[in-house]
Amino acid sequence: MKKSCIYPGTFDPITNGHLDVIIRATKIFDKVIVAVAKSDSKQPMFAHEKRIEMAKEAVCELKNVSVLGFDNLLVDFAKSHGINTVIRGLRAVSDFEYELQIGYANAALWDEFETVYLMPSLNNAFISSSIVRSVLRHDGDVSNLVPAKILKNLKA
């Protein structure tokens, strides 16, 4: 039986930390869907379509990974794809507290819903999209924070 998972996020932009978690997920699951949330409430730096495009570029060499956008409840997106497992990355205890609440809420919406938590490698544990956006706003170098394939998208 093939097992698939969804790795949801805003990916504003996708980072080396995200890519690390995606690669780890491919070692556990036969298929990984990177689900790029529209997330208008977060006021993203990059448009939804641009974030989808960057995610596709970042994972293009991973054969069992696909990228899709979504703008509905994660549980509904998962059901529509026949997948009941999501991957979430954890960098710190603060991530765990937030992700645990979200995981419980999703399970309350669909009792077959499972959340698997993965940690990025130590050298990527500090990276977040928020840090990348902050560095970008100050014209800093993010080449060690994001996949090389998307750097051209981040240049003003």
From Swiss-Prot:
Q: Does the keyword Oxidoreductase apply?
A: no
Q: What class of enzyme is it?
A: transferase
Cofactor(s) required, per the database record: Mg(2+)
Q: In which pathway does it act?
A: Cofactor biosynthesis; coenzyme A biosynthesis; CoA from (R)-pantothenate: step 4/5
Per the record, its GO cellular-component terms are: cytoplasm
Where along the sequence does the record put site: Transition state stabilizer?
Answer: H18
Q: Name one GO biological process term.
A: coenzyme A biosynthetic process
According to the UniProt entry, the coiled-coil residues are none
The record ties this protein, via Gene3D superfamilies, to: HUPs
Q: What is its main location?
A: cytoplasm
Amino-acid positions noted as binding ATP in the UniProt annotation, renumbered to this chain: T10, F11, H18, G89, L90, R91, E99, N124, A125, F126, I127, S128, S129, S130
**What EC number is given for this enzyme?**
2.7.7.3
| Residues holding substrate | T10, K42, L74, R88
Give the location in the cell: Cytoplasm
Give the record's subunit note: Homohexamer.
Please describe what this protein does: Reversibly transfers an adenylyl group from ATP to 4'-phosphopantetheine, yielding dephospho-CoA (dPCoA) and pyrophosphate.
Q: Which NCBIfam families does the UniProt entry name for this protein?
A: coaD_prev_kdtB (TIGR01510), cyt_tran_rel (TIGR00125)
Q: Which HAMAP family match?
A: PPAT_bact
Protein name according to UniProt: Phosphopantetheine adenylyltransferase
Organism equals Campylobacter concisus (strain 13826)
List the taxonomic lineage.
Bacteria, Pseudomonadati, Campylobacterota, Epsilonproteobacteria, Campylobacterales
